[in-house]
Amino acid sequence: MRLLGLDPGLRITGWGVIEVTGNRIGHVADGVVRSDDRLSLAARLAQLHGGIVAVLKAYEPVEAAVEETFVNRNPASTLKLGQARGAVMLAPALAGLVVAEYQPSVVKKAVVGTGGAAKDQVGMMIRTLLPGATLETADAADALAIAICHAHYRAGALSLALARAGGGR
Protein backbone atom coordinates (compact mmCIF):
# COMPACT_ATOMS: atom_id res chain seq x y z
CA MET A 1 0.00 0.00 0.00
CA ARG A 2 1.23 3.48 -0.83
CA LEU A 3 1.32 6.17 1.82
CA LEU A 4 1.89 9.89 1.30
CA GLY A 5 3.61 12.03 3.91
CA LEU A 6 3.23 15.81 3.73
CA ASP A 7 5.29 18.52 5.42
CA PRO A 8 3.37 21.73 4.67
CA GLY A 9 5.00 25.11 4.36
CA LEU A 10 4.00 28.23 2.45
CA ARG A 11 7.33 28.53 0.60
CA ILE A 12 8.17 24.84 0.36
CA THR A 13 5.94 21.84 1.01
CA GLY A 14 7.72 18.52 1.25
CA TRP A 15 6.12 15.29 0.10
CA GLY A 16 7.18 11.68 0.25
CA VAL A 17 5.60 8.45 -0.96
CA ILE A 18 6.46 5.07 0.50
CA GLU A 19 5.30 1.55 -0.30
CA VAL A 20 4.37 -0.64 2.67
CA THR A 21 4.22 -4.40 2.20
CA GLY A 22 3.76 -6.27 5.46
CA ASN A 23 6.45 -4.89 7.75
CA ARG A 24 8.68 -3.72 4.87
CA ILE A 25 8.85 -0.07 3.87
CA GLY A 26 10.27 1.07 0.55
CA HIS A 27 10.89 4.44 -1.06
CA VAL A 28 8.74 5.34 -4.05
CA ALA A 29 9.36 9.07 -4.55
CA ASP A 30 9.93 12.33 -2.73
CA GLY A 31 10.17 15.98 -3.56
CA VAL A 32 8.86 19.44 -2.87
CA VAL A 33 6.22 21.82 -4.14
CA ARG A 34 7.36 25.44 -4.13
CA SER A 35 5.19 28.52 -4.20
CA ASP A 36 6.24 31.75 -5.85
CA ASP A 37 6.58 34.40 -3.14
CA ARG A 38 5.94 37.14 -5.72
CA LEU A 39 2.33 35.98 -6.05
CA SER A 40 -0.65 36.70 -3.84
CA LEU A 41 -1.33 34.42 -0.89
CA ALA A 42 -4.32 32.89 -2.67
CA ALA A 43 -2.25 32.13 -5.77
CA ARG A 44 0.50 30.58 -3.64
CA LEU A 45 -2.01 28.36 -1.84
CA ALA A 46 -3.39 27.30 -5.23
CA GLN A 47 0.16 26.38 -6.34
CA LEU A 48 0.64 24.20 -3.28
CA HIS A 49 -2.73 22.53 -3.69
CA GLY A 50 -2.15 21.91 -7.40
CA GLY A 51 1.28 20.47 -6.75
CA ILE A 52 -0.07 17.96 -4.24
CA VAL A 53 -2.92 17.05 -6.61
CA ALA A 54 -0.26 16.23 -9.22
CA VAL A 55 1.60 14.04 -6.70
CA LEU A 56 -1.64 12.22 -5.89
CA LYS A 57 -2.32 11.55 -9.57
CA ALA A 58 1.24 10.42 -10.28
CA TYR A 59 1.72 8.05 -7.32
CA GLU A 60 -1.82 7.10 -6.26
CA PRO A 61 -1.35 6.75 -2.50
CA VAL A 62 -4.21 5.22 -0.52
CA GLU A 63 -3.66 7.21 2.68
CA ALA A 64 -1.96 10.44 3.65
CA ALA A 65 -0.42 11.87 6.79
CA VAL A 66 0.64 15.34 7.84
CA GLU A 67 2.52 16.79 10.77
CA GLU A 68 0.48 18.84 13.22
CA THR A 69 1.22 22.55 13.29
CA PHE A 70 3.38 24.09 15.95
CA VAL A 71 2.80 27.67 17.03
CA ASN A 72 5.50 30.16 16.04
CA ARG A 73 6.33 33.26 18.01
CA ASN A 74 5.12 35.28 15.04
CA PRO A 75 1.31 35.05 14.81
CA ALA A 76 1.29 36.07 11.12
CA SER A 77 3.70 33.23 10.26
CA THR A 78 1.60 30.75 12.21
CA LEU A 79 -1.52 31.87 10.36
CA LYS A 80 0.16 31.53 6.95
CA LEU A 81 1.47 28.08 7.87
CA GLY A 82 -2.04 27.08 8.88
CA GLN A 83 -3.41 28.28 5.56
CA ALA A 84 -0.73 26.37 3.65
CA ARG A 85 -1.45 23.29 5.73
CA GLY A 86 -5.15 23.57 4.90
CA ALA A 87 -4.48 23.87 1.17
CA VAL A 88 -2.14 20.87 1.26
CA MET A 89 -4.46 18.70 3.38
CA LEU A 90 -7.41 19.51 1.16
CA ALA A 91 -5.92 17.74 -1.87
CA PRO A 92 -5.89 14.19 -0.41
CA ALA A 93 -9.13 14.82 1.47
CA LEU A 94 -10.91 15.77 -1.76
CA ALA A 95 -9.45 12.65 -3.39
CA GLY A 96 -11.20 10.58 -0.71
CA LEU A 97 -8.12 9.71 1.33
CA VAL A 98 -8.13 9.78 5.09
CA VAL A 99 -5.51 12.26 6.29
CA ALA A 100 -3.89 11.33 9.60
CA GLU A 101 -2.11 13.90 11.75
CA TYR A 102 0.91 13.43 14.01
CA GLN A 103 2.73 15.66 16.45
CA PRO A 104 6.32 16.45 15.45
CA SER A 105 7.69 14.63 18.50
CA VAL A 106 5.76 11.47 17.56
CA VAL A 107 7.17 11.58 14.01
CA LYS A 108 10.73 12.01 15.31
CA LYS A 109 10.32 9.22 17.83
CA ALA A 110 8.95 6.85 15.18
CA VAL A 111 11.93 7.44 12.90
CA VAL A 112 14.87 8.32 15.15
CA GLY A 113 13.81 6.88 18.49
CA THR A 114 13.58 10.15 20.38
CA GLY A 115 10.99 12.91 20.15
CA GLY A 116 13.61 15.62 20.49
CA ALA A 117 15.69 14.61 17.46
CA ALA A 118 17.26 17.34 15.33
CA LYS A 119 16.41 17.77 11.64
CA ASP A 120 19.78 16.39 10.55
CA GLN A 121 19.18 13.24 12.61
CA VAL A 122 15.83 12.74 10.89
CA GLY A 123 17.47 13.17 7.48
CA MET A 124 20.23 10.71 8.34
CA MET A 125 17.72 8.07 9.46
CA ILE A 126 15.61 8.57 6.33
CA ARG A 127 18.71 8.00 4.17
CA THR A 128 19.40 4.83 6.17
CA LEU A 129 15.83 3.51 6.09
CA LEU A 130 15.10 4.53 2.49
CA PRO A 131 18.35 4.35 0.49
CA GLY A 132 16.71 5.52 -2.76
CA ALA A 133 15.40 8.76 -1.29
CA THR A 134 16.59 11.86 -3.15
CA LEU A 135 15.84 14.32 -0.33
CA GLU A 136 15.99 17.55 -2.29
CA THR A 137 15.41 19.43 0.98
CA ALA A 138 14.88 18.72 4.67
CA ASP A 139 11.18 19.19 3.92
CA ALA A 140 11.19 16.09 1.71
CA ALA A 141 13.00 14.14 4.45
CA ASP A 142 10.41 15.29 6.98
CA ALA A 143 7.59 14.24 4.66
CA LEU A 144 9.07 10.75 4.32
CA ALA A 145 9.45 10.62 8.11
CA ILE A 146 5.76 11.48 8.44
CA ALA A 147 4.87 8.70 5.99
CA ILE A 148 7.01 6.21 7.95
CA CYS A 149 5.41 7.34 11.20
CA HIS A 150 2.00 6.76 9.65
CA ALA A 151 3.05 3.30 8.51
CA HIS A 152 3.92 2.47 12.12
CA TYR A 153 0.87 4.03 13.74
CA ARG A 154 -1.73 3.80 10.98
CA ALA A 155 -4.04 1.24 12.57
CA GLY A 156 -4.76 3.44 15.58
CA ALA A 157 -4.59 6.71 13.66
CA LEU A 158 -6.82 5.42 10.87
CA SER A 159 -9.45 4.29 13.35
CA LEU A 160 -9.39 7.69 15.01
CA ALA A 161 -9.53 9.58 11.70
CA LEU A 162 -12.38 7.42 10.43
CA ALA A 163 -14.29 7.99 13.64
CA ARG A 164 -13.78 11.76 13.34
CA ALA A 165 -14.65 11.85 9.63
CA GLY A 166 -17.52 9.42 9.80
CA GLY A 167 -16.13 7.31 6.96
CA GLY A 168 -13.30 7.42 4.47
CA ARG A 169 -11.86 5.38 1.67
Curated annotation (Swiss-Prot):
Cellular component GO terms, alphabetical: cytoplasm; Holliday junction resolvase complex
EC annotation from Swiss-Prot or TrEMBL: 3.1.21.10
InterPro entries: RNaseH-like_sf, RNaseH_sf, X-over_junc_endoDNase_Mg_BS, X-over_junc_endoDNase_RuvC
Disulphide bond pairs: none
Record's keyword terms, sorted: Cytoplasm, DNA damage, DNA recombination, DNA repair, DNA-binding, Endonuclease, Hydrolase, Magnesium, Metal-binding, Nuclease
Catalytic residues identified in the record: D7, E67, D139
Domain of life: Bacteria
Major place of residence: cytoplasm
PROSITE patterns in alphabetical order: RUVC
Cofactor note: Binds 2 Mg(2+) ion per subunit.
One family name in Pfam for this protein: RuvC
Catalytic function, reaction form: Endonucleolytic cleavage at a junction such as a reciprocal single-stranded crossover between two homologous DNA duplexes (Holliday junction)
Protein residues bound to Mg(2+) 2: E67
Cofactors that this protein relies on: Mg(2+)
A GO term for molecular function: magnesium ion binding
Top-level EC class: hydrolase
UniProt-listed GO biological process terms: DNA recombination; DNA repair
Transmembrane residue ranges: none
Functional summary from the UniProt entry: The RuvA-RuvB-RuvC complex processes Holliday junction (HJ) DNA during genetic recombination and DNA repair. Endonuclease that resolves HJ intermediates. Cleaves cruciform DNA by making single-stranded nicks across the HJ at symmetrical positions within the homologous arms, yielding a 5'-phosphate and a 3'-hydroxyl group; requires a central core of homology in the junction. The consensus cleavage sequence is 5'-(A/T)TT(C/G)-3'. Cleavage occurs on the 3'-side of the TT dinucleotide at the point of strand exchange.
Entries under NCBIfam families matching the protein: ruvC
Subunit and interaction comment: Homodimer which binds Holliday junction (HJ) DNA. The HJ becomes 2-fold symmetrical on binding to RuvC with unstacked arms; it has a different conformation from HJ DNA in complex with RuvA. In the full resolvosome a probable DNA-RuvA(4)-RuvB(12)-RuvC(2) complex forms which resolves the HJ.
Family statement: Belongs to the RuvC family.
Name of the featured protein: Crossover junction endodeoxyribonuclease RuvC
Naturally occurring in which organism (per UniProt): Rhodospirillum rubrum (strain ATCC 11170 / ATH 1.1.1 / DSM 467 / LMG 4362 / NCIMB 8255 / S1)
Source species taxonomy: Bacteria, Pseudomonadati, Pseudomonadota, Alphaproteobacteria, Rhodospirillales
